């Protein structure tokens, strides 16, 4: 980088940070007059600052610039799972190669093992093609096709055509900064270092949330006319081995469940085939999309015997194949340290440096391996939540509770079914995030006045009392962190890639014991300021709750479908289980399981391509 460009970069970065912090000044209660409520408030509140949250916030502001739109986030807006999505963003823009929106929908539905709601998928795939042009126009620095000058595309697992648009292997990072710049430019306000505790609902309508300022420790009600949940997934239930950030603890999903919304398909959790051996950080699918091989200890490209698309088979197929190789003695190492190899050396240094620079850095950082010279050890890692808050309709991402909307991985509409295709997650974030923002803005416009916030204020008082209870008395934070590690191990051992009834029954028993221990835990630090141990305590409670939901649904789904592989029920059973699992919580805080039918339109269940 030249001296001039470095200076320009730093200048731009400083301007962006300054603008962001300017957006943090007085973000709530934008006007004070006789009609304003006594409690803090904003018109549209977005929880979560990933791609979905920022797209939602911008869409709401553009739909109605008079609305006050606030994004609450546990960390800096740029610290999220969107930044970690490396491979690309799906969307059909090249129709000359035989691709179409319908073919994208077919691949998505087939890859999702037909648990996708087909009406939603068709709308999603049409919107996906259009959003690529929108993000390109916004200034997203995509890699370019050297022949046409258009956005460059690569193959991804389960795809019939090249439709994954990319920016080297940093697509999510680049996309995230485009969305953040757009949000700042459009007057979106930010509450950084704030965590969601609960959602207040009165008479079937959202009245606000209980939120905690991590910096000061203040726990208070925040009223809003409409709420957008964009908190991402819950794969941190596999705490010891996941590719997602530490903040991906399903806070929004857990709060929605307690507020009365359904948790749809919680058992459907994707294991990405290639996480680094130590910890599970992602080696992007772009490595295989560019032609990388998976190699066992015999030096064989083993994927060719499992699927016709070899390394580019759907993720659930590749993950299972890798685990089978390891279980049958053709892997390297032992136990949780076992692995196979991902080899891209044959691509050459120039291609690796141009198209895969980030994963080269990741391999060096976590495994001390240079991909130019040697393969990197990999093993499946918990990566994506197909399940999420039950969404009522795709067009505005609304829920059954008036005023609550959901965007991105936190929701389940169900676009991804039982297994998400690579490249569809970023598309999901930008498409459903925008729809949620438009829906929330439209709803807020029709709400004349804020409620008095009685329910939300009551919940805030309960959480204030909870803080005092948990942070007083004896105990040790080490007990809490040991319990968190145990939760991750139990989930991985018994609800991982291969599941059985006996394993799931054992997990249910162990989760009850973990929950009982959690209720006795104390975090002996009454200091309210930057008490991150209490933040970890809240997150652990959410992870335990969501683990129990996933286990319950997995116990009762007596089939194998997508990411849900039952060794004791190895076949897909459309007659009994072409249904979505819906977990709800009753007034006694007991979990209940019900089902609803999958929406089937023109795509047959036998794998035939549409005409």
Task: Set out the residue ranges of the language-model regions.
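Glycine- and aromatic-enriched mobile tails/lids
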Residues: 33, 40, 51, 56-59, ...
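An anion/pyrophosphate-binding glycine-rich loop and adjacent beta-alpha core
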Residues: 255, 261-377, 439-445, 485
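N-terminal secretory signal peptides and thylakoid transit peptides that target proteins
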Residues: 1-17
């Amino acid at each position: 980088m030249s001296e001039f460009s470095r200076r320009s970069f730093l200048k731009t970065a400083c301007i962006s940070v300054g603008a962001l912090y300017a957006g943090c000044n007085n973000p709530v209660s934008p006007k004070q007059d006789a009609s304003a409520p006594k409690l803090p408030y904003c018109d549209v509140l977005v929880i979560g600052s990933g791609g979905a949250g920022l797209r939602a916030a911008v869409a709401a502001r553009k739909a109605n610039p008079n609305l006050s739109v606030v994004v609450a986030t546990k960390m800096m807006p740029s610290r999220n799972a969107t930044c970690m999505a490396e491979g690309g963003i799906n969307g059909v823009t090249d129709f000359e190669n035989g691709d179409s929106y319908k073919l994208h929908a077919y691949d998505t539905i087939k890859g999702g093992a037909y648990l996708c709601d087909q009406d939603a998928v068709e709308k999603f795939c049409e919107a996906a093609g259009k959003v690529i042009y929108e993000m390109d126009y916004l200034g997203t620095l995509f890699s370019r096709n050297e022949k046409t000058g258009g956005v460059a595309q690569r193959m991804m697992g389960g795809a019939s055509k090249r439709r994954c648009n990319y920016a080297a292997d940093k697509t999510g990072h680049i996309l995230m900064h485009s969305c953040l710049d757009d949000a700042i430019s459009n007057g979106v306000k930010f509450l950084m270092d704030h965590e969601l505790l609960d959602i207040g609902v009165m008479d079937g309508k959202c009245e606000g949330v209980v939120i905690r300022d991590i910096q000061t420790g203040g726990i208070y009600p925040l009223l809003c006319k409409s709420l957008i949940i964009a908190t991402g997934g819950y794969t941190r239930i596999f705490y010891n081995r996941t590719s997602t950030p530490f903040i991906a603890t399903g806070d929004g999903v857990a709060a929605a469940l307690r507020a009365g919304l359904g948790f749809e398909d919680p058992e459907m959790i994707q294991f990405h085939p290639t996480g680094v051996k130590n910890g599970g950080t992602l080696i992007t699918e772009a490595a295989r999309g560019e032609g990388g091989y998976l190699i066992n200890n015999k030096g064989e490209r083993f994927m060719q015997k499992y699927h016709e698309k070899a390394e580019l088979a759907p993720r659930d197929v590749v993950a299972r194949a890798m685990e089978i190789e390891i279980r049958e003695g053709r892997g390297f190492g032992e136990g949780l340290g076992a692995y196979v190899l991902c080899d891209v050396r044959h691509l050459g240094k120039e291609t690796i440096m141009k198209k895969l620079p980030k994963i080269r850095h990741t391999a060096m950082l976590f495994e001390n391996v240079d991909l130019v010279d040697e393969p990197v050890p990999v093993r499946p890692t918990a990566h994506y939540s197909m399940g999420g808050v039950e969404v009522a309709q795709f067009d505005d991402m609304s829920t059954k509770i008036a005023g609550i909307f959901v965007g991105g991985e936190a929701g389940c509409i169900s676009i991804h079914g039982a297994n998400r295709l690579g490249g569809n997650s970023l598309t999901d974030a930008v498409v459903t995030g925008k729809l949620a923002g438009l829906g929330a803005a439209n709803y807020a416009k029709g709400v004349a006045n804020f409620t008095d916030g009685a329910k939300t204020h009551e919940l805030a008082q309960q959480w204030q009392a909870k803080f005092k209870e948990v942070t007083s008395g004896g105990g040790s934070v080490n007990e809490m962190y040991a319990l968190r590690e145990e939760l991750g191990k139990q989930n991985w051992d018994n609800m991982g890639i291969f599941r059985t009834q006996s394993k799931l029954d054992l997990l249910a028993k162990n989760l009850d014991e973990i929950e009982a221990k959690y209720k006795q835990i104390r975090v002996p630090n009454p200091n309210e300021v930057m008490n991150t141990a209490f933040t970890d305590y809240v997150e652990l409670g959410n992870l335990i709750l969501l683990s129990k939901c996933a286990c319950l649904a997995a116990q009762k789904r007596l089939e194998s479908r997508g990411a849900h592989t039952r060794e004791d029920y190895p076949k897909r059973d459309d007659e009994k289980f072409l249904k979505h699992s819906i977990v709800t919580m009753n007034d006694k805080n007991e979990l209940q399981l019900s089902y609803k039918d999958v929406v089937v339109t023109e795509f047959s269940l036998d794998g035939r391509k549409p005409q």
